[in-house]
């Protein structure tokens, strides 16, 4: 039996985009900082890293599709924060963002990591953006790095 998995180390020539929603920027700025930190710590070249900003989480799938279609990137780390409010808006936005991101990843067969927080309140979001529960942006970039490595291994 053979176990095949990715490594948490970049080769240094991977072109990566971080796609970030600006809405709830107090949270998403921290997620983005965590993702950038992870990229640099694991061998990424800052000159090969692009930050792409969109107004809100609903727009993430559309721009992700454009980024993957361009074939400029080896992978994309998607970040956002959707916080439940008093209306069903949260349910619609989180469902469509999640489905759209998954669809684009499968459509282009490209590594994409999901760092979109879906929380019941601002406190939960803050906890996941660098306090009690770690930084989910850092974790999302870690996932992308492993996916990139695994894809290289599977290519042979």
Swiss-Prot record:
Gene3D superfamilies: Lumazine/riboflavin synthase. Pathway: Cofactor biosynthesis; riboflavin biosynthesis; riboflavin from 2-hydroxy-3-oxobutyl phosphate and 5-amino-6-(D-ribitylamino)uracil: step 1/2. GO terms for biological process: riboflavin biosynthetic process. It catalyses: (2S)-2-hydroxy-3-oxobutyl phosphate + 5-amino-6-(D-ribitylamino)uracil = 6,7-dimethyl-8-(1-D-ribityl)lumazine + phosphate + 2 H2O + H(+). GO terms for cellular component: cytoplasm; cytosol; riboflavin synthase complex. PANTHER family: 6,7-DIMETHYL-8-RIBITYLLUMAZINE SYNTHASE (PTHR21058:SF0), 6,7-DIMETHYL-8-RIBITYLLUMAZINE SYNTHASE DMRL SYNTHASE LUMAZINE SYNTHASE (PTHR21058). (2S)-2-hydroxy-3-oxobutyl phosphate binds at residues 86-87, 128. HAMAP family: Lumazine_synth (MF_00178). InterPro entries: LS (IPR034964), LS/RS (IPR002180), LS/RS_sf (IPR036467). Pfam families: DMRL_synthase (PF00885). Transmembrane segments: none annotated. This is 6,7-dimethyl-8-ribityllumazine synthase. One of its GO terms (molecular function) is 6,7-dimethyl-8-ribityllumazine synthase activity. The lineage of its organism: Bacteria, Pseudomonadati, Campylobacterota, Epsilonproteobacteria, Campylobacterales. 5-amino-6-(D-ribitylamino)uracil binds at residues 23, 57-59, 81-83, 114. Keywords: Riboflavin biosynthesis, Transferase. It comes from Helicobacter pylori (strain ATCC 700392 / 26695). The gene is ribH.
